Amino acid sequence: MNERVKSKARPDPTSDREEGGAFDPKFGADGLATCVTVDASRGDVLMVAHMNEAALRATLATGIVHYWSRSRGALWRKGDTSGQTQTLVEMRVDCDQDAFLAFVTVAGDGGACHTGRRSCFYRRVQTDGDTARLAFIEPSTLNGDSETDRQHVDCKATPD
């Protein structure tokens, strides 16, 4: 009878981060981690933004989602100017704790995008092999400008 012997090898140091119960987020060299924000009731992706440690702490402490604005170089409490405050329902972290998934409810008009739309993902990339074209997929914007939704933007799929 040949029995398998379990190895007593030293455990992988990433196993606690990947399989353990300790929340130990890993931020990139720029101090940021990606956050995908999802409508908690519908499951739609609303936006993708970034969090630094301060934004994450503020989000968890207040229940209102905060991000790090790369363009302004400042902490950003979503909704301060637009009224589209995002209340955290649930926060998830990916396997190696360097990306977050925030399930939220949105106050105000329910929008998340600075363009006035509910989601930042309102265009589909279509291609015929050589040329990529952006087609608007959301039937209307929150401000009712459906003409904007019918416009298309052309670009080359590959660099010249």
Label each residue range with its predicted role.
Residues E3-L32, V38-L46, M51-D160:
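C-terminal binding/interaction regions
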